[in-house]
């Protein structure tokens, strides 16, 4: 599994292209979780976008922003980018909070059912998470982009969803490859 964010996702994309895409090592790739930058399907020739929660050998990516808001440079930085659903891991465009497995908050606790999301072209729109002292998450988003940008939490918002999905993908890969 390759997991990265933002500048790390820039590096992960280069590593995937150079060492995995269409190469023997691709058979060992379970999943690449590469949020925080604009990723295009065309960035890879053989590594495909994963569109169901058990699929392996591909990648997922997303960029998180406050619902009903668009960044100033939306067309350049987000539009046209891959937008995976980091809760259902399929093509559902809207997910209610009851399906959210949990975010990792600053108190090091997991808070399930704390946000709703909607996928648009190049972005995941989210509600402000329902967590204790949510003032801190609102403050952090204001310090970045006037309360709209949740880039700083692309991973934390979906922490438990990513964790559980990676387990599903690992188990499926092991099953198909007959590894105990």
Predicted regions located by residue number:
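Gly/Ala-rich beta-loop-alpha elbow adjacent to hydrolase catalytic centers
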Residues: 2-12
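Surface-exposed patches in mature extracellular/periplasmic domains of secreted proteins
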Residues: 1-2, 174-179
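Surface cap/lid and interfacial helix-loop subdomains adjacent to catalytic sites
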Residues: 18-168, 172, 176
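Short, hydrophobic alpha-helix immediately C-terminal to the catalytic nucleophile
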Residues: 13-17
């Amino acid at each position: 599994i390759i997991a990265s964010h933002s500048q790390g996702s820039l590096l992960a994309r280069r590593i995937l292209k150079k060492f995995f895409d269409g190469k023997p090592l691709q058979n060992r790739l379970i999943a690449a979780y590469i949020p925080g930058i604009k990723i295009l399907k065309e960035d890879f020739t053989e590594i495909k976008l994963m569109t169901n929660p058990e699929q392996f050998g591909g990648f997922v990516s997303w960029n998180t922003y406050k619902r009903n808001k668009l960044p100033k440079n939306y067309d350049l930085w987000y539009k046209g980018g891959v937008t995976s659903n980091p809760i259902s891991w399929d093509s559902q465009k809207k997910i209610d909070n009851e399906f959210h497995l949990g975010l990792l908050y600053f108190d090091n606790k997991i808070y399930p059912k704390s946000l709703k999301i909607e996928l648009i072209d190049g972005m995941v729109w989210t509600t402000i998470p329902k967590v204790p002292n949510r003032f801190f998450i609102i403050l952090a988003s204001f310090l970045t982009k006037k309360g709209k940008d949740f880039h700083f939490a692309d991973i934390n918002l979906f922490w438990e969803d990513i964790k559980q999905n990676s387990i599903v993908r690992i188990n499926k890969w092991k099953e198909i490859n007959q590894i105990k």
